A protein has these predicted regions:
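Extracellular/periplasm-exposed beta-strand and loop segments of Gram-negative cell-envelope proteins
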Residues: 12-16, 51-58, 65-90, 116-132, ...
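Outer-membrane beta-barrel transmembrane strands
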Residues: 1, 16, 82-105, 130, ...
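Transmembrane beta-barrel strands of outer-membrane/channel proteins
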Residues: 1-3, 38-44, 108-114, 152-162, ...
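Outer-membrane beta-barrel "beta-signal"
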Residues: 31, 344-356
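Elongated scaffolding segments in large macromolecular assemblies
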Residues: 86-158, 170-172
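Internal, well-ordered domain-core segments that constitute the primary functional module
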Residues: 1-70
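Short loop/turn motifs that connect adjacent beta-strands in outer-membrane beta-barrel proteins
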Residues: 30-37, 100-105, 143-153, 209-219, ...
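Transmembrane beta-barrel strand/turn architecture of Gram-negative outer membrane proteins
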Residues: 18-42, 132-155, 245-254
Protein backbone atom coordinates (compact mmCIF):
# COMPACT_ATOMS: atom_id res chain seq x y z
CA UNK A 1 0.00 0.00 0.00
CA UNK A 2 1.26 3.47 -0.86
CA UNK A 3 -0.23 6.91 -0.24
CA UNK A 4 0.99 10.31 -1.27
CA UNK A 5 0.25 14.00 -0.94
CA UNK A 6 2.29 15.72 -3.61
CA UNK A 7 2.72 19.48 -3.75
CA UNK A 8 4.27 21.31 -6.69
CA UNK A 9 3.72 25.01 -6.33
CA UNK A 10 5.92 26.33 -9.15
CA UNK A 11 3.62 25.06 -11.88
CA UNK A 12 -0.08 24.22 -11.90
CA UNK A 13 -0.19 20.65 -10.72
CA UNK A 14 -0.25 21.18 -6.98
CA UNK A 15 -1.96 19.22 -4.23
CA UNK A 16 -2.04 15.84 -5.94
CA UNK A 17 -3.40 13.03 -3.76
CA UNK A 18 -2.35 9.45 -4.46
CA UNK A 19 -3.62 6.08 -3.21
CA UNK A 20 -1.90 2.98 -4.58
CA UNK A 21 -2.38 -0.54 -3.28
CA UNK A 22 -2.15 -4.13 -4.48
CA UNK A 23 -3.49 -7.45 -3.21
CA UNK A 24 -1.56 -10.59 -4.26
CA UNK A 25 -2.89 -13.96 -3.04
CA UNK A 26 -0.61 -16.85 -4.03
CA UNK A 27 -0.17 -20.59 -3.59
CA UNK A 28 2.90 -22.80 -4.13
CA UNK A 29 3.38 -26.54 -4.36
CA UNK A 30 6.81 -28.17 -3.90
CA UNK A 31 7.88 -31.73 -4.63
CA UNK A 32 11.44 -33.06 -4.69
CA UNK A 33 13.50 -30.35 -6.44
CA UNK A 34 10.54 -28.72 -8.19
CA UNK A 35 8.22 -25.88 -7.17
CA UNK A 36 5.10 -24.64 -8.93
CA UNK A 37 3.46 -21.35 -8.04
CA UNK A 38 0.25 -19.59 -9.01
CA UNK A 39 -0.71 -16.08 -8.00
CA UNK A 40 -3.33 -13.50 -8.84
CA UNK A 41 -3.42 -9.84 -8.04
CA UNK A 42 -5.62 -6.78 -7.99
CA UNK A 43 -3.95 -3.39 -8.31
CA UNK A 44 -5.80 -0.12 -7.77
CA UNK A 45 -4.22 3.28 -8.31
CA UNK A 46 -6.06 6.55 -7.80
CA UNK A 47 -4.55 9.98 -8.37
CA UNK A 48 -6.72 12.98 -7.65
CA UNK A 49 -5.97 16.59 -8.53
CA UNK A 50 -8.45 18.88 -6.73
CA UNK A 51 -8.92 22.55 -7.57
CA UNK A 52 -5.43 23.67 -8.54
CA UNK A 53 -3.61 26.41 -6.67
CA UNK A 54 -0.22 27.73 -7.68
CA UNK A 55 2.21 30.53 -6.94
CA UNK A 56 3.00 30.72 -10.65
CA UNK A 57 2.09 34.23 -11.86
CA UNK A 58 3.05 34.04 -15.55
CA UNK A 59 -0.03 35.41 -17.40
CA UNK A 60 0.89 33.42 -20.52
CA UNK A 61 1.11 30.05 -18.78
CA UNK A 62 -0.92 27.41 -20.62
CA UNK A 63 -2.47 24.18 -19.41
CA UNK A 64 -2.62 21.44 -22.02
CA UNK A 65 -5.08 18.67 -22.75
CA UNK A 66 -3.09 15.94 -24.48
CA UNK A 67 -5.02 13.38 -26.55
CA UNK A 68 -2.22 11.72 -28.53
CA UNK A 69 0.69 12.45 -30.88
CA UNK A 70 0.73 16.15 -31.89
CA UNK A 71 -2.77 16.77 -30.56
CA UNK A 72 -2.34 18.91 -27.45
CA UNK A 73 -4.65 21.87 -26.90
CA UNK A 74 -3.23 24.62 -24.68
CA UNK A 75 -5.41 27.15 -22.90
CA UNK A 76 -3.97 30.21 -21.16
CA UNK A 77 -4.98 30.02 -17.51
CA UNK A 78 -6.72 26.72 -18.22
CA UNK A 79 -5.66 25.35 -14.85
CA UNK A 80 -7.99 27.75 -13.05
CA UNK A 81 -10.71 25.65 -11.43
CA UNK A 82 -9.29 22.52 -13.07
CA UNK A 83 -10.05 19.13 -11.53
CA UNK A 84 -8.89 15.71 -12.65
CA UNK A 85 -9.02 12.19 -11.27
CA UNK A 86 -7.34 9.03 -12.61
CA UNK A 87 -8.64 5.69 -11.32
CA UNK A 88 -6.97 2.51 -12.57
CA UNK A 89 -8.11 -1.05 -11.85
CA UNK A 90 -5.78 -3.85 -12.94
CA UNK A 91 -6.28 -7.60 -12.60
CA UNK A 92 -3.57 -10.12 -13.35
CA UNK A 93 -2.11 -13.53 -12.72
CA UNK A 94 1.26 -15.27 -12.76
CA UNK A 95 2.39 -18.86 -13.20
CA UNK A 96 5.90 -19.75 -12.01
CA UNK A 97 8.11 -22.84 -12.06
CA UNK A 98 11.37 -23.40 -10.16
CA UNK A 99 13.93 -26.18 -10.30
CA UNK A 100 16.80 -26.29 -7.82
CA UNK A 101 19.63 -28.67 -7.00
CA UNK A 102 23.25 -28.34 -5.88
CA UNK A 103 24.45 -27.05 -9.27
CA UNK A 104 21.43 -25.64 -11.08
CA UNK A 105 18.77 -23.18 -10.07
CA UNK A 106 16.19 -21.91 -12.54
CA UNK A 107 13.02 -19.84 -12.20
CA UNK A 108 10.58 -19.13 -15.03
CA UNK A 109 7.45 -16.99 -14.76
CA UNK A 110 4.62 -16.13 -17.13
CA UNK A 111 2.25 -13.31 -16.26
CA UNK A 112 -0.78 -11.57 -17.74
CA UNK A 113 -2.50 -8.36 -16.65
CA UNK A 114 -5.52 -6.38 -17.83
CA UNK A 115 -6.03 -2.78 -16.75
CA UNK A 116 -8.70 -0.12 -17.22
CA UNK A 117 -8.16 3.50 -16.24
CA UNK A 118 -11.02 5.97 -15.99
CA UNK A 119 -10.35 9.69 -16.26
CA UNK A 120 -12.77 12.03 -14.49
CA UNK A 121 -13.25 15.78 -14.30
CA UNK A 122 -15.76 17.84 -12.36
CA UNK A 123 -19.18 16.22 -11.71
CA UNK A 124 -17.83 12.99 -13.22
CA UNK A 125 -17.09 14.56 -16.60
CA UNK A 126 -14.92 12.05 -18.46
CA UNK A 127 -12.66 12.86 -21.43
CA UNK A 128 -11.95 9.17 -22.03
CA UNK A 129 -10.78 5.78 -20.84
CA UNK A 130 -7.49 3.89 -21.20
CA UNK A 131 -7.16 0.10 -21.48
CA UNK A 132 -3.92 -1.88 -21.12
CA UNK A 133 -2.98 -5.51 -21.67
CA UNK A 134 0.43 -6.72 -20.48
CA UNK A 135 2.27 -9.99 -21.12
CA UNK A 136 5.54 -10.82 -19.38
CA UNK A 137 8.05 -13.67 -19.57
CA UNK A 138 10.97 -13.91 -17.15
CA UNK A 139 13.60 -16.64 -16.92
CA UNK A 140 16.45 -16.53 -14.37
CA UNK A 141 19.05 -19.30 -14.43
CA UNK A 142 22.11 -20.05 -12.28
CA UNK A 143 24.57 -22.85 -13.10
CA UNK A 144 27.50 -23.54 -10.75
CA UNK A 145 30.69 -25.31 -11.79
CA UNK A 146 33.48 -25.33 -9.21
CA UNK A 147 34.43 -21.73 -8.41
CA UNK A 148 32.53 -20.34 -11.39
CA UNK A 149 28.86 -19.59 -11.86
CA UNK A 150 26.97 -18.94 -15.09
CA UNK A 151 24.14 -16.42 -14.86
CA UNK A 152 21.61 -16.31 -17.71
CA UNK A 153 18.60 -13.99 -17.48
CA UNK A 154 15.92 -13.45 -20.14
CA UNK A 155 12.99 -11.05 -19.92
CA UNK A 156 10.34 -10.16 -22.51
CA UNK A 157 7.59 -7.64 -21.85
CA UNK A 158 4.82 -6.65 -24.26
CA UNK A 159 2.13 -4.09 -23.52
CA UNK A 160 -0.63 -2.73 -25.69
CA UNK A 161 -2.63 0.34 -24.69
CA UNK A 162 -5.83 1.67 -26.21
CA UNK A 163 -7.46 5.02 -25.43
CA UNK A 164 -11.14 5.69 -26.01
CA UNK A 165 -12.05 9.36 -26.35
CA UNK A 166 -15.45 10.80 -25.38
CA UNK A 167 -17.39 13.83 -26.57
CA UNK A 168 -19.79 14.93 -23.85
CA UNK A 169 -22.28 17.67 -23.09
CA UNK A 170 -23.34 18.97 -19.71
CA UNK A 171 -27.03 18.50 -18.93
CA UNK A 172 -28.62 20.74 -16.29
CA UNK A 173 -32.06 19.80 -14.99
CA UNK A 174 -34.27 21.79 -12.64
CA UNK A 175 -36.94 20.27 -10.43
CA UNK A 176 -40.15 22.21 -11.17
CA UNK A 177 -41.41 21.68 -7.63
CA UNK A 178 -38.36 22.37 -5.47
CA UNK A 179 -36.40 24.50 -7.93
CA UNK A 180 -33.26 22.47 -7.17
CA UNK A 181 -30.87 22.11 -10.08
CA UNK A 182 -28.84 18.98 -10.83
CA UNK A 183 -26.32 18.38 -13.57
CA UNK A 184 -24.54 15.49 -15.25
CA UNK A 185 -22.47 14.77 -18.35
CA UNK A 186 -24.04 12.94 -21.29
CA UNK A 187 -21.78 11.09 -23.76
CA UNK A 188 -22.65 12.05 -27.33
CA UNK A 189 -19.86 10.27 -29.19
CA UNK A 190 -17.16 7.70 -28.42
CA UNK A 191 -13.97 7.35 -30.47
CA UNK A 192 -13.01 3.72 -29.84
CA UNK A 193 -9.23 3.15 -29.82
CA UNK A 194 -8.51 6.64 -31.10
CA UNK A 195 -4.99 6.45 -29.66
CA UNK A 196 -3.06 3.16 -29.40
CA UNK A 197 0.37 2.29 -28.02
CA UNK A 198 2.36 -0.93 -28.53
CA UNK A 199 5.53 -1.43 -26.50
CA UNK A 200 7.92 -4.40 -26.65
CA UNK A 201 11.04 -4.80 -24.49
CA UNK A 202 13.35 -7.82 -24.69
CA UNK A 203 16.50 -8.26 -22.62
CA UNK A 204 19.16 -11.01 -22.57
CA UNK A 205 21.96 -10.96 -19.98
CA UNK A 206 24.81 -13.42 -19.51
CA UNK A 207 27.48 -13.20 -16.80
CA UNK A 208 30.32 -15.55 -15.83
CA UNK A 209 31.14 -15.09 -12.16
CA UNK A 210 34.29 -16.23 -10.35
CA UNK A 211 34.27 -16.62 -6.56
CA UNK A 212 36.66 -17.47 -3.74
CA UNK A 213 36.81 -21.20 -2.93
CA UNK A 214 36.77 -20.70 0.84
CA UNK A 215 34.47 -17.72 1.41
CA UNK A 216 32.24 -17.89 -1.68
CA UNK A 217 32.81 -14.16 -2.16
CA UNK A 218 32.73 -12.90 -5.77
CA UNK A 219 36.16 -11.94 -7.08
CA UNK A 220 35.62 -11.24 -10.80
CA UNK A 221 33.03 -11.35 -13.56
CA UNK A 222 32.65 -10.97 -17.31
CA UNK A 223 29.47 -10.77 -19.31
CA UNK A 224 27.37 -9.42 -22.14
CA UNK A 225 23.92 -7.91 -22.53
CA UNK A 226 21.60 -7.48 -25.50
CA UNK A 227 18.50 -5.28 -25.42
CA UNK A 228 15.75 -4.60 -27.97
CA UNK A 229 12.88 -2.13 -27.83
CA UNK A 230 10.01 -1.42 -30.20
CA UNK A 231 7.52 1.44 -29.76
CA UNK A 232 4.51 2.11 -31.99
CA UNK A 233 2.14 5.02 -31.33
CA UNK A 234 -0.90 5.50 -33.56
CA UNK A 235 -3.47 8.32 -33.51
CA UNK A 236 -6.59 7.92 -35.66
CA UNK A 237 -9.00 10.42 -37.20
CA UNK A 238 -6.87 12.15 -38.41
CA UNK A 239 -3.98 9.71 -38.72
CA UNK A 240 -0.56 10.30 -37.14
CA UNK A 241 2.03 7.73 -36.07
CA UNK A 242 5.42 7.24 -34.45
CA UNK A 243 7.54 4.09 -34.80
CA UNK A 244 10.86 3.60 -33.00
CA UNK A 245 12.96 0.43 -32.93
CA UNK A 246 16.35 0.24 -31.26
CA UNK A 247 18.86 -2.30 -29.93
CA UNK A 248 21.83 -2.21 -27.57
CA UNK A 249 24.77 -4.61 -27.28
CA UNK A 250 27.05 -4.28 -24.27
CA UNK A 251 30.11 -6.03 -22.78
CA UNK A 252 30.98 -5.86 -19.08
CA UNK A 253 33.65 -7.01 -16.68
CA UNK A 254 35.00 -6.47 -13.19
CA UNK A 255 37.82 -7.60 -10.91
CA UNK A 256 38.37 -7.33 -7.17
CA UNK A 257 41.80 -6.52 -5.69
CA UNK A 258 43.14 -6.30 -2.12
CA UNK A 259 40.61 -8.74 -0.69
CA UNK A 260 41.38 -8.96 3.01
CA UNK A 261 39.52 -8.29 6.27
CA UNK A 262 36.37 -6.97 4.55
CA UNK A 263 38.49 -4.69 2.40
CA UNK A 264 38.43 -4.81 -1.38
CA UNK A 265 39.01 -2.66 -4.43
CA UNK A 266 36.64 -3.29 -7.32
CA UNK A 267 37.39 -2.05 -10.84
CA UNK A 268 34.49 -2.45 -13.27
CA UNK A 269 34.17 -1.51 -16.94
CA UNK A 270 31.39 -1.51 -19.49
CA UNK A 271 31.38 -0.78 -23.24
CA UNK A 272 28.65 -1.08 -25.82
CA UNK A 273 26.88 0.23 -28.88
CA UNK A 274 23.31 1.43 -29.26
CA UNK A 275 21.78 1.00 -32.73
CA UNK A 276 18.82 3.00 -34.01
CA UNK A 277 17.10 0.46 -36.27
CA UNK A 278 14.26 2.75 -37.37
CA UNK A 279 12.63 6.02 -36.34
CA UNK A 280 9.65 7.15 -38.40
CA UNK A 281 7.29 10.01 -37.63
CA UNK A 282 4.19 10.82 -39.67
CA UNK A 283 2.09 13.77 -38.51
CA UNK A 284 -1.20 14.99 -39.87
CA UNK A 285 -0.35 18.52 -38.68
CA UNK A 286 3.37 19.09 -38.02
CA UNK A 287 2.79 22.80 -37.33
CA UNK A 288 1.20 22.34 -33.89
CA UNK A 289 2.99 23.67 -30.83
CA UNK A 290 3.58 20.21 -29.38
CA UNK A 291 4.93 18.85 -32.67
CA UNK A 292 7.35 21.77 -33.07
CA UNK A 293 8.50 21.79 -29.44
CA UNK A 294 8.63 18.07 -28.62
CA UNK A 295 7.96 15.48 -31.32
CA UNK A 296 10.09 16.84 -34.17
CA UNK A 297 13.14 17.71 -31.99
CA UNK A 298 12.90 14.26 -30.35
CA UNK A 299 13.49 12.55 -33.70
CA UNK A 300 17.16 13.56 -33.55
CA UNK A 301 17.42 11.55 -30.33
CA UNK A 302 15.44 8.56 -31.62
CA UNK A 303 17.47 8.39 -34.83
CA UNK A 304 20.89 8.51 -33.18
CA UNK A 305 23.19 5.51 -32.78
CA UNK A 306 25.97 5.82 -30.25
CA UNK A 307 28.92 4.12 -28.60
CA UNK A 308 29.21 4.34 -24.83
CA UNK A 309 31.66 3.35 -22.14
CA UNK A 310 31.74 3.37 -18.35
CA UNK A 311 34.48 2.88 -15.75
CA UNK A 312 33.80 2.46 -12.05
CA UNK A 313 36.20 2.10 -9.12
CA UNK A 314 34.94 1.20 -5.66
CA UNK A 315 36.88 0.69 -2.43
CA UNK A 316 35.20 -0.78 0.62
CA UNK A 317 36.52 -1.05 4.16
CA UNK A 318 35.24 -1.62 7.71
CA UNK A 319 34.72 1.49 9.83
CA UNK A 320 34.04 1.41 13.58
CA UNK A 321 32.01 4.23 15.13
CA UNK A 322 31.09 4.03 18.83
CA UNK A 323 31.95 0.32 18.94
CA UNK A 324 29.70 -0.44 15.95
CA UNK A 325 31.43 -1.67 12.81
CA UNK A 326 29.96 -1.30 9.33
CA UNK A 327 31.41 -1.76 5.88
CA UNK A 328 31.74 1.63 4.15
CA UNK A 329 32.51 2.29 0.51
CA UNK A 330 33.64 5.15 -1.69
CA UNK A 331 32.92 4.93 -5.40
CA UNK A 332 34.00 6.98 -8.42
CA UNK A 333 32.25 6.64 -11.78
CA UNK A 334 33.02 8.05 -15.21
CA UNK A 335 31.02 7.58 -18.43
CA UNK A 336 31.35 8.78 -22.01
CA UNK A 337 28.88 8.64 -24.89
CA UNK A 338 29.51 9.52 -28.56
CA UNK A 339 26.74 9.60 -31.18
CA UNK A 340 26.84 9.40 -34.95
CA UNK A 341 25.29 12.90 -34.96
CA UNK A 342 28.60 14.45 -33.83
CA UNK A 343 27.35 14.98 -30.30
CA UNK A 344 28.65 13.52 -27.07
CA UNK A 345 28.18 13.54 -23.32
CA UNK A 346 30.47 13.06 -20.35
CA UNK A 347 29.56 12.12 -16.80
CA UNK A 348 31.55 11.86 -13.60
CA UNK A 349 30.27 11.01 -10.16
CA UNK A 350 31.49 10.14 -6.70
CA UNK A 351 29.54 8.59 -3.84
CA UNK A 352 30.06 7.53 -0.25
CA UNK A 353 27.94 5.01 1.61
CA UNK A 354 27.77 1.98 3.86
CA UNK A 355 26.37 -1.55 3.83
CA UNK A 356 24.08 -2.26 6.75
Amino acid sequence: YKGGYLSRLKYPRARTNLADYQLTPAVTYTWNKHSLGLSGYYHRRKEKIPNITTVQTDPNLKYYTFTGMENADGTTGGYSGFEREFVNHEFGGELSYQYKNERIQTLTTLSYAKGNEDVWGDIKYSPGKYHTTTYNLLSMNRIKSGRTEHIIDISINYQTGKADEYRQEKIIEKDPVTGIESSYWNTLLTYDERYTVDLLNANLHYRLLWSNHHTGEATAYAGARAYFQSVEDQYNLPSSSLTVRQATICMEGGYSFLRKNNRSLWIEAEAGYHISLSSDLSLNDPSTEYAQSVLLPDMTYYGASYAHGKLQIQYQMPVTIKKHTNVWFVKATGAYLKTDKKTDSKMFGISLGLYH
